[in-house]
Amino acid sequence: MELKKNYKFWFATGSQDLYGDECLSHVAKHAQIIVQNFNESGILPFEVVWKPTLIDSTSIRRTFEEANADEECAGVITWMHTFSPAKSWIAGLQAFKKPLLHLHTQFNEEIPYDTIDMDFMNENQSAHGDREFGHIVTLPHLCICGM
């Protein structure tokens, strides 16, 4: 891959609409913060571009097909914020032809043990969603796990 070209990495966040619009707005905000931090860090050779949260197999497949067609897209970084059913990703992953990096981490650096409730638990299930997603990924990929 020619590094002189102005490539971009897409950041695709998985979730589902089971927990409602408020939860999905938190998911989008968290993903945008991660993208901003990637871009401000200077550790990646190209810009990371936030994509809207993917909540169903149709939007997932469409996003991967658009990534395939976009000559500036060097690859996609995936992250499962809330529990994103892995079966929703199968058709998109089968269609995808570019590098994939699976970011397997929670958004929060620390768990708020004193105030944790079911809303927090439901909204922050990335560990479960990422494990299931990692299991079904059949393309050569890299999985980065955080603490």
Language model features with spans:
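Metallocofactor- and cofactor-centric catalytic cores in central/energy metabolism, strongly enriched
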Residues: 1-147
